[in-house]
Structures are given as C-alpha cells and as structure tokens.
Amino acid sequence: MEQYEKVEKIGEGTYGVVYKALDKATNETIALKKIRLEQEDEGVPSTAIREISLLKEMNHGNIVRLHDVVHSEKRIYLVFEYLDLDLKKFMDSCPEFAKNPTLIKSYLYQILHGVAYCHSHRVLHRDLKPQNLLIDRRTNALKLADFGLARAFGIPVRTFTHEVVTLWYRAPEILLGARQYSTPVDVWSVGCIFAEMVNQKPLFPGDSEIDELFKIFRILGTPNEQSWPGVSCLPDFKTAFPRWQAQDLATVVPNLDPAGLDLLSKMLRYEPSKRITARQALEHEYFKDLEVVQ
C-alpha cells in the first residue's frame, strides 16, 4: 500500500469506503476501493482473489479499468481509474438531460457496449444502477464500475454503513428467488436505467422485495405461465399475487419514440431467455442514427 497515498474519502459504495488517492509511482490520481469483508475474522477468501484477478484482464473503453489489487491478511484494496461523476449525480444536477435524446442514446449505447463486452467474457454485473455508471467529463465516455464484484464478494442486503442496497434495477427472476440466472439480469437493469434517463425518475422504485415486484407487475402486468413459462415454479412466486394488467409502455415512458419503446419492451421481457441480449440490442434500429457524443 506504500505506493498509494489517500487524498480524501469520496464515497461509500456497496462494499466499503472509496478514496481518491495518488499513485506515487506514476503521479496519477486513482480511486482506491477498500473492500470490507463480511467474515473479517477469516481473512480474504482465495476465491475472491482469483475472481478479482481475472477482472484485471478486462480492457474496454466502457469499463472502469482495474489497475491493481492489493491485499493484506484482513482486507483487500482495488485500484481503479479515477472518475468523479456518475450517472445518478449527472441526472440529479442536470434535469434538462431528459430533453437530449441524442445524449441518452449515446449513453445507452455505451452502457450496452460495456455490458456486451463483459458478457462475452462470461462476467455478470448483477447490480447495475446509475450510481455505478461513471462519466468522463472530458470525453462524455460512460464507463461501468464494479463489474464482477458481486461474484467475488456477494451482494450484501445492506452496505457497511447500513444503507439498504437498492432493488430498483433488480430483475424479476432474482426477486422471485431463481437459483440459476445469467446475463439477462443485467439487460433488465439497463432497461430500467434507460427508462429512468428518459423519464428523469426511476421506473420501479420499490422499497422492499415485494414492493419492487408489485411495482413491476403494475406496469408490465402480473406474470403467468402464458407470459413467462415456468414462473409459477420459482421459489417466491405466489398464486395469490394480485393480478394486474399490463400498461401500454408508451403511456409509461411518453417521451420515448417508437423505436426506443420497442427496444425498451425487449429489455423488459419477463422470460429471461426471450429478453434481448446486449449484443442484439446494439444492432437495434433505435441506434441507426446514432452519433456517439464526443
């Protein structure tokens, strides 16, 4: 750790404190993420070290670069490139963003690019949300942070500061207790983020797992064996769920054009195997007039 000098604490993420720091060898500003481990008495699990080491190989313009992993007996520090703006902060400080369909399209394209790259390397995110989509102010490049950390460390129910980890972007198969799930969970999250960029408010802001499910059901309709074959076999599915009818997405996201609505509906498909993939989404007609904003 002698190589890195902490400058200031910049935030508290899902896994621990994040510092702005200086790499004394290169004089570069970096982000230092201190991972707080659940079973601290047992030290750093070797599986976590292996998982994280694989992430150093990930190299893509829309992924936050992991430069280094430093671990001692009890804790692990991840050294990332430093970016001080995230999509949540940007949306909060810039409400007129919703009136810029070109920038929304560019950001969505970049998110999907990063997700498709990770999925092609068999890495899932599982916790995509506006707070871990970082923006480079100089280039307008958008980069995904924290990819792969869920597999290495699990997703806690609460952060170490006891904030509840958000459920707003969580796919219905996870909420319904599916043991096996895969890359479609990230596409669902991206769909939720897409709608939020357009509406300037979250699509499904649930405050508990059941509230989250019901917020989804009220808009997309309560799933059944017709709309989602196999749903009734998921551990937390109840036949007693209230039965809501699906709303027309055009009334839910009124400022989105028909191509955007078509893409959004394909990202928010209930049946995971029928959900569009990130790679397919990049080819969607919504992006045909895309100019990546530089």
Swiss-Prot record:
GO MF term (any one): RNA polymerase II CTD heptapeptide repeat kinase activity
Protein's job: Plays a key role in the control of the eukaryotic cell cycle. Component of the kinase complex that phosphorylates the repetitive C-terminus of RNA polymerase II.
CC terms in the record's Gene Ontology section: cyclin-dependent protein kinase holoenzyme complex; cytoplasm; nucleus
Name of the encoding gene: CDC2
Summary of activators and inhibitors of this protein: Phosphorylation at Thr-14 or Tyr-15 inactivates the enzyme, while phosphorylation at Thr-161 activates it.
InterPro entries membership: CDK, Kinase-like_dom_sf, Prot_kinase_dom, Protein_kinase_ATP_BS, Ser/Thr_kinase_AS
Enzyme class: transferase
Family that this chain belongs to: Belongs to the protein kinase superfamily. CMGC Ser/Thr protein kinase family. CDC2/CDKX subfamily.
Modified residues (Phosphotyrosine): Y15
Catalytic function, reaction form: L-seryl-[protein] + ATP = O-phospho-L-seryl-[protein] + ADP + H(+); L-threonyl-[protein] + ATP = O-phospho-L-threonyl-[protein] + ADP + H(+); [DNA-directed RNA polymerase] + ATP = phospho-[DNA-directed RNA polymerase] + ADP + H(+)
Record: active site: D127
Binding site for ATP: I10, G11, E12, G13, T14, Y15, G16, V17, V18, K33
Keywords annotated in UniProt: ATP-binding, Cell cycle, Cell division, Kinase, Mitosis, Nucleotide-binding, Phosphoprotein, Serine/threonine-protein kinase, Transferase
Modified residues (Phosphothreonine): T14, T161
Residues of the Protein kinase domain: 4-287
Origin superkingdom: Eukaryota
Protein name: Cell division control protein 2 homolog
Pfam families assigned to the protein according to its UniProt record, in alphabetical order: Pkinase
Cited SUPFAM superfamilies: Protein kinase-like (PK-like)
